[in-house]
């Protein structure tokens, strides 16, 4: 009735190391799935999504369900995750890829033809604006602040209790 004898029955659904009990997220090994085709996530953008059954459902040592219940629930978890993902990608992948393509094309066009020319124009104009601003600051704002400071420096307050 041990867990080791039941592992052979569910070998179809799970890997051998799926039974290891650990307390952290176990990211998938890229070499493990190397023979299954081209790498669809070469920059590991979604490595955080590779969660196993033990990362979602965990039983403490003091309370364990029956081995068959644990194995069946593990198998159903993996199968439902696989089937629902495939089902959703059939209906959502193409429209969302189309929408993402339109969004990124629009953002790229805006960045290339509007934002970058505006930024470059601002960077070209800023040295002259900086010179004018420094002159205005030195001629108007600095003397004004100095005179206001001198005026307030002669103010003194005396409090008396009556």
UniProtKB/Swiss-Prot annotation:
This protein's species is Loxodonta africana (African elephant)
Query: Topology: which residues are Cytoplasmic?
Result: 1-86, 108-162
Give this protein's Gene Ontology molecular function annotations: D1 dopamine receptor binding; protein heterodimerization activity; protein homodimerization activity; protein kinase binding; protein-macromolecule adaptor activity; scaffold protein binding
GO terms of biological process kind: basement membrane organization; caveola assembly; endoplasmic reticulum organization; endothelial cell proliferation; insulin receptor signaling pathway; mitochondrion organization; negative regulation of endothelial cell proliferation; negative regulation of skeletal muscle cell proliferation
What is the protein name given in its UniProt record? Caveolin-2
Tell me what PTMs the record reports for this protein. Phosphorylated on serine and tyrosine residues. CAV1 promotes phosphorylation on Ser-23 which then targets the complex to the plasma membrane, lipid rafts and caveolae. Phosphorylation on Ser-36 appears to modulate mitosis in endothelial cells. Phosphorylation on both Tyr-19 and Tyr-27 is required for insulin-induced 'Ser-727' phosphorylation of STAT3 and its activation. Phosphorylation on Tyr-19 is required for insulin-induced phosphorylation of MAPK1 and DNA binding of STAT3. Tyrosine phosphorylation is induced by both EGF and insulin (By. similarity).
Subunit-structure text: Monomer or homodimer. Interacts with CAV1; the interaction forms a stable heterooligomeric complex that is required for targeting to lipid rafts and for caveolae formation. Tyrosine phosphorylated forms do not form heterooligomers with the Tyr-19-phosphorylated form existing as a monomer or dimer, and the Tyr-27-form as a monomer only. Interacts (tyrosine phosphorylated form) with the SH2 domain-containing proteins, RASA1, NCK1 and SRC. Interacts (tyrosine phosphorylated form) with INSR, the interaction (Tyr-27-phosphorylated form) is increased on insulin stimulation.
Cite the PANTHER family for this sequence: CAVEOLIN, CAVEOLIN-2
Cell membrane as a keyword of this entry, yes or no, is: yes
Where are the Phosphoserine residues found in this chain? 20, 23, 36
């Amino acid at each position: 009735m041990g867990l080791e004898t039941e592992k052979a029955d569910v070998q179809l659904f799970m890997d051998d190391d799926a039974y290891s009990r650990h307390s952290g997220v176990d990211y998938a090994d890229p070499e493990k799935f190397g023979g299954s085709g081209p790498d669809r996530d070469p920059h590991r953008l979604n490595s955080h999504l590779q969660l196993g059954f033990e990362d979602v459902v965990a039983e403490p040592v003091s309370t364990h369900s029956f081995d068959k219940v644990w194995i069946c629930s593990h198998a159903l978890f993996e199968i439902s995750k696989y089937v629902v993902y495939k089902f959703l990608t059939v209906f959502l992948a193409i429209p969302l890829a189309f929408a993402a393509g339109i969004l990124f094309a629009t953002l790229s066009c805006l960045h290339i033809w509007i934002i970058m020319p505006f930024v470059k124009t601002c960077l070209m104009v800023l040295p002259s604006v900086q010179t004018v601003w420094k002159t205005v600051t030195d001629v108007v704002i600095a003397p004004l602040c100095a005179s206001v400071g001198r005026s307030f420096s002669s103010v003194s307050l005396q409090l008396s209790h009556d």
